[in-house]
Regions:
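Boundary/linker segments flanking structured domains
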Residues: 1-11, 70-107
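GIY-YIG nuclease catalytic motif and its immediate N-terminal context
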Residues: 1-39, 89
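A positively charged, amphipathic N-terminal helix/segment that binds anionic biomolecules
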Residues: 4, 16-19, 26, 45-47, ...
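Conserved short loop/helix modules at catalytic or binding sites
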Residues: 31-84
């Protein structure tokens, strides 16, 4: 019997988060793992930091992490939402209204 890969749920929880250093802001979204939302945000933040320190990315967020250091950033959950589509809609709306300087696009 061949096992089929299990389809990922499309309605799991996601969180919209804000990273800030001084007046520079980044808005992002990630899924909530089986653990707590705080752990999921920490995992995502550490991925941003790892990418900034080990890859030669010139994305605005990576440059800011290298310039100011990871400890200078305030990392916070903005909203927890059920469903990927809803989370991305909120992220896009926040990007339009907040106009964060560290996001690489302005969806």
């Amino acid at each position: 019997m061949i096992k089929k890969a299990r389809k990922k749920r499309s309605d799991r929880n996601h969180l919209v988060y804000k990273l800030q250093v001084g007046k520079l802001v980044y808005i992002g979204v990630t899924h909530v793992d089986r653990g707590s939302p705080a752990k999921s945000l920490r995992r995502r933040w550490l991925k941003h930091v790892q990418r900034a320190m080990t890859e030669d990315r010139q994305w605005k967020l990576c440059v800011a992490i290298r310039k100011h250091g990871a400890d200078a950033f305030n990392v916070e959950i903005v909203k927890i939402v059920r469903g990927k589509t809803a989370a991305h809609e909120i992220e896009r709306e926040l990007i339009r209204t907040v106009k964060p300087k560290l996001n690489t696009d302005d969806r």
